[in-house]
Amino acid sequence: MADQLADKLKSTQLSDGSPGASDEWKKNLNLPAKDNRQQTEDVTNTKGLEFENFALKRDLLMGIFEAGFEKPSPIQEESIPVALTGRDILARAKNGTGKTAAFVIPTLERINPKISKIQCLILVPTRELAMQTSQVCKTLGKHLGINVMVTTGGTGLRDDIIRLQDPVHIVVGTPGRILDLAGKNVADLSECPMFIMDEADKLLSIEFTPVIEQLLQFHPKDRQVMLFSATFPLSVKDFSDKNMVSPYEINLMDELTLRGITQYYAFVEEKQKVHCLNTLFSKLQINQSIIFCNSTNRVELLAKKITELGYSCFYSHAKMQQHARNRVFHDFRNGVCRNLVCSDLLTRGIDIQAVNVVINFDFPKNAETYLHRIGRSGRYGHLGLAINLINWDDRFNLYNIERDLGTEIQPIPASIDKSLYVYENPESIPRPISNLPRGQLPAAQGQQSPQQQQQYQQPQQTQQAGLPQQGQGNWQSQNPQHGNPHYNNGGRGRGGRGRGYRGRGGQGQGGRGRGPPRDVQP
């Protein structure tokens, strides 16, 4: 079906009736800097379609091009024309190949802003992914007059109830919170024709499936259901058979791992892992890195160790308060800090273009988790590294993951070729469009030179006293306006489950840092 539509669409062009006028509007677009990084066939192996071939609204095309999109990726070519027809879709594609835009673009095209009803529900498994997806909707649809609302657990219902008193066309959120709003008759889904699940394999796991089934009861029977994911377990087929009508199946997983990611392992004893990580920091040319641990406790302990070594570091996990998680996510995406230590909270769908190195400080237990972790680098066909610190107990997991994914994880060489992961022009890496008002952006954002954007990391002790470089030093001392307890606050203290630790090279003068309370829920 998609091939037939593609053939028809290749000959389709928008026109307002006058020669040459169809391209005149492009000259007035506020286009971002061109991203000239090398891309792999994961996103370049297309049928040659253009976004104009889909007969989209001009205002939507303007948002697409101003967001930096040039041509549709393979998953977008396959899904957009089918989604526009209203047919149910089961789409499977690799991490970081443009799945979000593959369902957001047809959604924005089909929504009528004159109808003050919820017309699309987008479900995601985590709060961070909900924020990211809602921002994509707002960015691509900024010329359409469409209202987008994001709602997740961990916050009060009052603000959501007030927000829903005004027209909302798209709701992006986590299942539990949406069910609360629908069950209280605050969110009216009775005329919502589109039901979308991103990271569908996670949403159809045991913990979410009952909620998903209940949510579907609030939708009309003739709704369009679209599922997108990188992996489709049997639970997805069961859901499809029960709740979808002749879904169009898209499978672009000729292989599971992204071609741009080079994978290595280093065999180290547990007690030598921090030393090994320090060596990697000193030798790799890191733009931004994400370091994964297998527990929230180890996340905090490792973040403390990295700070003590003198490197800038954020941490995030599910037991942190929501406002702290939001701030960490926002600031890391905008390049305020170079390294992020986290649990598997951020393995799902998170798109940070500047991340070129992922380190599994703790090796994952299964292939699915490994696949999603390493997919945080090498986004959208670009290059990246995945480095795994392996101890004796991990050796069988390493073998099993290689077998299950059909990939090879090589021993780390003494020297890693920079061409495998280093960007020649890091200043051209796209940064997300912030939704903070002007003047409220982090102080360091937008002030990095290309040399600061990408360099070998050096401990803070080597920096001139009082003048830490961007991405270096204890970030709280560089950004004193952030009084958040999860940003190491100068000095040392205890509170709940967390700690605050004094960084080196900063300007903090004592005080106490506090971690998340013991009773905070994920």
Curated annotation (Swiss-Prot):
It is found in: Cytoplasm, P-body. Gene3D superfamilies: P-loop containing nucleotide triphosphate hydrolases (3.40.50.300). Residues 1-10 have a biased composition (Basic and acidic residues). InterPro entries: DEAD/DEAH_box_helicase_dom, Helicase_ATP-bd, Helicase_C-like, P-loop_NTPase, RNA-helicase_DEAD-box_CS, RNA_helicase_DEAD_Q_motif. Residues 260-420 form the Helicase C-terminal domain. The gene is DHH1. Its EC number is 3.6.4.13. This is ATP-dependent RNA helicase DHH1.
